[in-house]
C-alpha cells in the first residue's frame, strides 16, 4: 500500500481505539466516585513507562533537538495531551459519551479554520463537502441524546468544546513539528512532558487515599492507559505524518459513530435507526475525503 493508504489505515485504527476512552471514563465514574483529577493521574502515570521506554530508545535519533524544539514539544504536550484530556474528563461528568463525542469531534472544523488562519491552507471542495456530510451524520447519531439533559449539560459541553479547541491546535501545530522531529519521538517526548502537570495537579488537589479504588476502576484505568492512550497516540502520529492534519481530522468523524454503538452496548445509551442513518452519512463523508479519484 501507498504511504497515504497506510496513513488512512493508521488513522482509522487509532481513532477507533481512542473512541473507547469516553466509555471507560463513564464506566469508571459509574463504578466509583473517582474525580477527573485522579482518573487523569492514573491514565498518565500508567502509560508513562511505555513512553519513557520509547523516548530512551529514540534518544540518539537525528536530528538533534534544539531548545526551540523542546519548547515546542513541551507546549504541544501540555496543550494536546494534558489540557485537552483534563477538560474532556471534566466534561464527561455531565454529558453522555455520545453527546460528548459530538462536541469533541467538532475539532475537524476547528482544524480547518486554524489551518486557514495560521498556515494559509484553503480547504478543497471535497473537504468542505465531506465536513458537511460527516457533521450532518454526527448530528443524527447523537441528536436524540441531547434532549432531556440537566442544567449541568451546558457546563459539561463547554469543557468538552474547550478540549476540542485544544486538540485542534495540537493537530495543526503538531503536523509541522512531527515532520521535523519524527512522529514516534514527538509523541513519546510530549506525552512524558504532559505527565508532569497531571502529577502536580493530583499532588496539590487530592489526598493519597484517592488511590484507594475498587479493582474495576483500576482495570478501566489500565485499559485506558494502554489500549486507549499508548496505541492510538502512536498510530495517530504516524497517520498525521502521512496524510496531514486536515484529512486526519475529517477521518476522525467516524469516532462518534463507534462511540454511539459501544455506548448503546455498554452504557445503555440509545441507538436508533436515525443514528444508524447518521453513521452511514459519516462513513460516506470519510470515504469521500479518503479515497482518491481514479485518473
Regions found by a protein language model. Give the residues of each.
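Loop-to-transmembrane-helix transition segments
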Residues: 6-16, 42, 62-87, 155-163, ...
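Membrane-interface helix termini and inter-helical loops of multi-pass transporters
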Residues: 23-33, 90-93, 142-153, 202-216, ...
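Transmembrane alpha-helices of multi-pass small-molecule transport proteins
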Residues: 32-82, 110-114, 166-173, 187-206, ...
Amino acid at each position: 500500500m501507498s504511504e497515504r493508504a497506510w496513513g488512512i489505515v493508521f488513522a482509522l485504527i487509532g481513532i477507533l481505539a481512542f473512541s473507547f476512552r469516553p466509555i471507560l471514563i463513564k464506566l469508571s465514574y459509574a463504578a466509583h466516585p473517582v474525580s477527573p483529577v485522579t482518573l487523569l493521574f492514573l491514565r498518565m502515570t500508567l502509560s508513562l513507562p511505555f513512553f519513557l521506554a520509547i523516548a530512551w530508545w529514540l534518544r540518539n535519533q537525528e536530528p538533534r533537538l534544539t531548545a526551540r524544539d523542546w519548547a515546542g514539544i513541551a507546549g504541544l504536550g501540555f496543550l494536546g495531551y494534558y489540557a485537552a484530556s483534563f477538560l474532556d474528563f471534566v466534561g464527561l461528568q455531565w454529558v453522555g459519551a455520545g453527546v460528548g463525542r459530538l462536541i469533541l469531534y467538532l475539532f475537524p472544523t476547528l482544524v480547518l479554520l486554524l489551518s486557514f488562519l495560521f498556515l494559509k491552507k484553503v480547504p478543497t471542495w471535497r473537504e468542505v463537502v465531506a465536513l458537511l456530510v460527516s457533521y450532518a451524520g454526527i448530528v443524527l447519531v447523537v441528536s436524540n441524546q441531547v434532549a432531556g439533559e440537566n442544567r449541568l449539560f451546558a457546563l459539561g459541553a463547554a469543557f468538552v468544546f474547550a478540549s476540542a479547541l485544544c486538540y485542534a491546535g495540537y493537530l495543526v501545530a503538531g503536523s509541522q513539528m512531527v515532520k521535523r522531529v519524527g512522529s514516534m519521538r514527538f509523541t513519546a517526548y510530549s506525552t512524558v512532558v504532559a505527565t508532569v502537570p497531571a502529577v502536580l495537579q493530583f499532588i496539590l488537589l487530592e489526598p493519597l487515599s484517592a488511590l484507594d479504588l475498587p479493582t474495576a476502576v483500576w482495570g478501566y484505568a489500565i485499559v485506558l492507559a494502554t489500549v486507549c492512550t499508548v496505541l492510538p497516540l502512536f498510530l495517530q502520529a504516524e497517520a498525521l505524518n502521512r496524510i496531514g492534519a486536515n484529512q486526519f481530522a475529517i477521518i476522525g468523524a467516524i469516532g462518534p459513530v463507534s462511540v454511539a454503538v459501544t455506548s448503546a452496548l455498554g452504557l445503555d445509551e440509545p441507538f436508533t435507526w436515525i443514528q444508524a442513518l447518521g453513521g452511514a452519512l459519516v462513513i460516506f463523508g470519510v470515504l469521500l475525503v479518503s479515497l482518491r479519484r481514479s485518473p
